[in-house]
Amino acid sequence: MVDVNRFKSMQITLASPSKVRSWSYGEVKKPETINYRTLKPEREGLFDEVIFGPTKDWECACGKYKRIRYKGIVCDRCGVEVTRAKVRRERMGHIELKAPVSHIWYFKGIPSRMGLTLDMSPRALEEVIYFAAYVVIDPKDTPLEPKSLLTEREYREKLQEYGHGSFVAKMGAEAIQDLLKRVDLAAEIAELKEELKSASGQKRIKAVRRLDVLDAFNKSGNKPEWMVLNILPVIPPDLRPMVQLDGGRFAASDLNDLYRRVINRNNRLARLLELNAPGIIVQNEKRMLQEAVDALIDNGRRGRPITGPGSRPLKSLSHMLKGKQGRFRQNLLGKRVDFSGRSVIAVGPTLKMYQCGVPREMAIELFKPFVMREIVAKEYAGNVKAAKRMVERGDERIWDILEEVIKEHPVLLNRAPTLHRLGIQAFEPVLIDGKALRLHPLVCEAYNADFDGDQMAIHVPLSEEAQAEARLLMLAAEHILNPKDGKPVVTPSQDMVLGNYYLTMEDAGREGEGMIFKDKDEAVMAYRNGYAHLHSRVGIAVDSMPNKPWKDNQRLKIMVTTVGKILFNDIMPEDLPYLQEPNNANLTEGTPDKYFLEPGQDIQEVIDGLEINVPFKKKNLGNIIAETFKRFRTTETSAFLDRLKDLGYYHSTLAGLTVGIADIPVIDNKAEIIDAAHHRVEEINKAFRRGLMTDDDRYVAVTTTWREAKEALEKRLIETQNPKNPIVMMMDSGARGNISNFSQLAGMRGLMAAPNGRIMELPILSNFREGLSVLEMFFSTHGARKGMTDTALKTADSGYLTRRLVDVAQDVIIREDDCGTDRGLLIRAITDGKEVTETLEERLQGRYTRKSVKHPETGEVLIGADQLITEDMARKIVDAGVEEVTIRSVFTCATRHGVCRHCYGINLATGDAVEVGEAVGTIAAQSIGEPGTQLTMRTFHTGGVASNTDITQGLPRIQEIFEARNPKGEAVITEVKGNVVEIEEDASTRTKKVYVQGKTGMGEYVVPFTARMKVEVGDEVNRGAALTEGSIQPKRLLEVRDTLSVETYLLAEVQKVYRSQGVEIGDKHVEVMVRQMLRKVRVMDPGDTDLLPGTLMDISDFTDANKDIVISGGIPATSRPVLMGITKASLETNSFLSAASFQETTRVLTDAAIRGKKDHLLGLKENVIIGKIIPAGTGMARYRNIEPQAMNEIEVIDHTEVSAEAVFTAEAE
């Protein structure tokens, strides 16, 4: 067997007849499969053991030779070689066709490769191949045109006219084969190149297409006549199996039926030819053979598909590859794996961040081989077989061994759908009773898991390397940050938030207020014994917490705090300031001075002078976690998170918050507010009846009135709420629910949307506490149902978007340290009108500068060129008043097939500089796809009457951008740089004309009357600027401006959609995707290169082709950039394996075979398909080829504080 990991590349070509014969182990002559009496394969049939190998290991068909010792002997009685039965998956046979047959992929594909090679129309080809017309092959001395078609009648007439043998005309695939053999590739190519110099329009397009195909044949060494088959390969029998079902019936693969038809027809044709049957009968049989082979290769491509029982179309060879159930996606890209299990999940509140609970029964099955090895090593059993019996019997001793085996052996947990890389994480297993897997509550957010019946899969990494990678790279405790935005993904939620909220509440006048304690223990003791309340404000000696970063003037004082906050701060990392107020100043700069008693001051006096602080909410906890991570990195953060979780659960249990109907407050003046609204609506309707407003205006006014009424109720609710009300606490802390839920419980439900999407004028006046009337209930059910269907549709849409994104960017990997480019990207804050979508500070964090940044006023250099911009540095740059900075960007990176570390910046998931080998393309795709489900499905109307276009938003807009479609509501853009000199309105055509005066001439643009203008007379506009509101068509922008402007525009547009929905995504992810859409160019003029005009190629390949020509002083080729949607870009990738496994499998393979394409296995997908280690992360050559060194050869790293991660990477490099 070939060692997959030694592959350099993989090529696909057309198979020549001699190649097919060399694969074959014998000819299949009979359509029989197996003998139904003996169940043995028939001789010379489709399952013949002589051709394909024995059905049982080391045993010939007749049973003369059995056992491995006869390996390699061919039995003299039955002719079967004694070998493994596995060869029945590898050995092929063949069928010698009695008449040539065209291959349907090359004849029927779009464009028809046969048609282009011969310069014949597909329809003409079809007539010839299926025996409806003759084609002139050699006119000899007659005036007939070569390749012209003759009907049966015309053929006879011409024969009589010119005499027999005066010209050659044939029908069927044989004729096509003769024509293909006559094609002189070199001469045709030269002729077409000449033609291209003068041709234009349709003629030129056709010439370019023919040239493309002929050139492909010429370069690849494939012969055009191989598109017609004389010999048909038969795939190995174990790939088209026959299985016996209960009851003696057989289930067989459809391919066997299709092969049987071919063999039957082929044998019948052979017999007819032997008998010298009449031509018409032979022709008919040849046509049927042609159709049988078509059905075998691609059933249903031409005419009606051949059906099996129950009129189900049979699955042909092409169907075996296509689609989700095809070979590529079902078996090569996603396999079922051993050592895996699946179970329902339950919460494990006592687990540590790096642990998960595994039921004993699952663990013993998953770790069976490890346990058996230990049993034999401890000599509890003599051999593996006995050990296996011990495990299956459930011997008492196996449980202790299991405990040993799983120690330090991480397992992987995965929850479907795996939307991003945090959907699979590693944990150390802890054995538990019961049958459910136990999951740490904090990792739920990353998995998007809850405990209402979700299931998860568990996998065991087997090899030492796999275990090391799971522990070092995938351990859940290491994944604190979300790769999409670099914010913590493990923020506490629900009970944990509620517990910490309750713990940090303050209350005036509670028992024990004003007591002073010498240290934490005394305070806790007072609280436990009922002398002080959790919320009462008390004093504590500062010097009892010597490790906190106090200011010098605070160290010897007494500080005012609450018992709860003493407990809360006790779990904080030591070097974090004492948290007294839930704000960033306290977190970053230290505890404010107002909480400290001056010597001799009365504590009650200070307490009375202080305001009551609000408790710590979910957002504040998130900020604390982010700060902890920034200062202390992973290990300390995950330990702190566990303490925070335990404290939260403990105190939410103690608080015992419950919610009942009596906790929903009643708004005293609800009736007044609603009466006033009714009154206002009546006035509006009166005005409408008098003709003072249009129906549209009335509708807007009515809906606005009810909206304002609802807001008034909401406002009243917030004003009158009691902060100790459990519902209010739940909402305010961020544990669950928000103000709109609260206002539906206590205020009014408000306006509802009708099924047509329009808002109904009749609002629902009741709230859930009062209960809804039947009519109100009926109105509100539509919204609920629409919500459910929307979610279902959105999930599918978002999943498909992620798949396309992953496909287009899967080969973008960090390939080198620095590409040395001299280009950069000038960035500023992204704005939408007056609103800031993304600030400059956010965009700068974690990027490298391209040029140094100077203070705009003092001229002082804030940061040099090619330096990493940290969070603090970004703030400093923005505070200095800098508005734009030139940074290194993925857009301008010069690395081939990937990105370099400097152009990418930090890895958001770790907060450190990105490592070489990181698969940033896949991470980018997941980061953009994963929040897709949070985007809305709706396309909004923009405010009533003002505009005549719909503006697409949410998920449809993201798809529109990434597929580079023409947007809905397109903006008119200018092609000249200059000033707007005039905007004239033309009432007759209902349009406006905008005139822009540039240096070279005047630009005149017609825009619809109703369009909102973005420019006024006198404005200065750049090329490609939008004159009206709406989305710019990116392909149009590319014609007017350069690639970088288009990339910048697309980046800003994607960010606008996501930010408007409150989803943050790092710029670099969008940059990676957009760069992939613009990596191809189309050759315009080939110059002195041997490129063909109109060819689509990678920018790097194009530059290479020009390099040699420029050096030798020739004329280089010219090209223009092409913007491709992600689906098209995936299919145009250089790897045919990746493209074929994505979509349009047959088209991709047809094209690749003709070109004799080589797949250099650079991306991830192609390596997964052939089963090779992927060239990313630890699979990169630079990590795999490391030679182990003796310790004395390695330079010792300085013994400053080096974290475990740093040591690991230093060794890896």
UniProtKB/Swiss-Prot annotation:
SUPFAM superfamilies: beta and beta-prime subunits of DNA dependent RNA-polymerase (SSF64484). It is an enzyme of class 2 (transferase). Zn(2+) 1 binds at residues 60, 62, 75, 78. It catalyses: RNA(n) + a ribonucleoside 5'-triphosphate = RNA(n+1) + diphosphate. Its cofactor is Mg(2+); Zn(2+). Signal peptide: none annotated. It holds the Pfam family RNA_pol_Rpb1_4. SMART domains: RPOLA_N. GO terms for molecular function: DNA binding; DNA-directed RNA polymerase activity; magnesium ion binding; zinc ion binding. Belongs to the RNA polymerase beta' chain family. This is DNA-directed RNA polymerase subunit beta'. It comes from Streptococcus pyogenes serotype M5 (strain Manfredo).
